Structures are given as C-alpha cells and as structure tokens.
Design a protein with these regions (language model features):
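A cross-kingdom feature marking solvent-exposed beta-strand/loop segments within repeated
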Residues: 4-6, 28-40, 59-76, 91-112
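Short, structured motif recognition centered on aromatic/hydrophobic residues
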Residues: 5-8, 12, 22, 46, ...
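Vicinal oxygen chelate
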Residues: 44-45, 80, 89-134
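C-terminal "cap" of GNAT-fold acetyltransferases
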Residues: 36-51
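Amphipathic alpha-helical segments
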Residues: 16-29, 88, 92-94
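Short loop/beta submotifs within extracellular cysteine-rich repeat domains
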Residues: 26-29, 53, 63-64, 122-123
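N-terminal beta-strand motif that seeds the catalytic metal site of vicinal oxygen chelate
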Residues: 1-17, 75-82, 131-134
C-alpha cells in the first residue's frame, strides 16, 4: 500500500522568502512552483534525495490558512505515496477516521487525501497517488 514518504509539508507566510531561506541555508533547489486551487495554496517542491520538502503558502480560506492562523509557520504534514489511493483509503478507513472519504486533485495532476489527525497521534497525514512517471 505505502511505497515511501513522498513529502514533508511546511506552512509558510511568504513562499518567496521561504524558498530563499531553504536555498541559502540548506542549498536546496526548487523543482516546481504551482498553485492548487482545491486547497487554496501556492506550493514549491524542493527535492532532498527521493523525498520532497513542500512549502505551502495559503492564498485563501482553507486548512492551510487555518493552520497558519492557529500555529504560525512550521511543520504541517507528512505525506505517504501510495500505489492505489482508493484502496488505501478503503483499508485505512476501517482502522481510523478519514478527513477525505474520496481523493481530491492535488499538485502535478496527483490525487490526494487526508486522514483525521486524532487517529494518527495528532500528526497531519496525507496520502498521494501520482501519475505514472511523475
């Protein structure tokens, strides 16, 4: 079901400033920047080996803006890459509560879904199914 850790999400107030920090301090390079309307965020992906650092700046009301207002900038979620997100949600949904009963559109044509954090020891947990070759 789970292939690997896909990315670690970090909420930021200003995406350009955050990119500069991660570039200047850690030497990371931006692979992709895009806007995901479904989640009202602008995101940047910075590869670290096979895992991505995902910087998220809210651009409207939603989960990310709520998180920023309540907690400030910082670690937001961990995302696991799955081979079949529908099957993963069906299996995991028998064991814990799902925030998303069905996958939603994510960045780069992916499909994503979140679990309820309470069932995951208060860790915001996401599944992603990427297009073949992505």
């Amino acid at each position: 079901m789970i292939e690997k850790i896909d990315h670690i999400g970090i909420v930021v107030r200003d995406l350009e400033k955050a990119i500069k920090v991660y570039s200047d301090v850690l030497g990371l390079k931006v692979d992709k920047v895009e806007q995901v309307e479904e989640f009202k965020v602008k995101i940047a992906f910075l590869p670290v080996g096979e895992v991505l650092v995902e910087l998220l700046e809210p651009i409207g009301p939603g989960m990310v803006q709520d998180f920023l207002a309540e907690h400030g900038e910082g670690l937001y979620h961990i995302c696991y890459k799955v081979t079949d997100i529908d099957k993963a949600l069906e299996e995991v949904g028998k064991k814990t509560k799902l925030r998303d009963k069905r996958p939603r559109p994510g960045g780069a044509g992916s499909r994503v879904a979140f679990l309820e954090p309470e069932g995951m020891l208060n860790v915001e947990t996401e599944f992603v199914e990427r297009k073949k070759g992505a």
